[in-house]
Amino acid sequence: MQIKQGIILGAVLGLATSRMALAEPTALDLIKRGDDYVGVQSKDKVVQIYSDKSVASLQPNIWHIVYFDSSVFPKITEVKFEAGQETDVGHPMRPFTLPAKPDQIVDLSKITVDSDRAAQIAASQPLLKGLNLRYSRITLEKGDSGPEWKVQLWSAKVSDPTKDADVGDVRISAADGSVIQSNLHPGNAGGTE
């Protein structure tokens, strides 16, 4: 009896471990990986993290970690990750955007809510109940009250589920997970306002 229980427990733990290993890395997981691709002057000096619009789920798998870098003109070094693998390191010029400043560096020690949890919090907003949420775009920046996640969401259209609609965004404190601002428009999906 104990052997059977041990085998079952081992199988469950093995499955859980393999599922965790297959999970996409979160935005915060990628900061440490990104540190390997930037100079000493930029390590842990993140001014922004942003994702591309997710594909096939609410969790994005293409991320851009933007570091403050005083040694180059735009004052940033950007490391791009696709499915957890570094694919590009550069110093992008952003038209109509001023160079980064040291006061834009996000205080990473204040962050307790990672990108996956921010997406869950945004998706659980009461206005979105009943919608088939499909995609997200997630950004982390320094806000007025500390680090903030901005989660933009897309839903399947009610009238034509093959099409999607931008249903707005939610700003979430990365320190405590509280909703700072909700700018949702469920009517864009054909639901109720």
Name every feature range the model reports, one short phrase each.
Residues M1-I8:
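Bacterial N-terminal signal peptides that target proteins for export
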Residues G10-S18:
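Bacterial N-terminal signal peptides
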Residues M20-E193:
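Long, terminal "pre-/pro-" and other extracytoplasmic accessory regions
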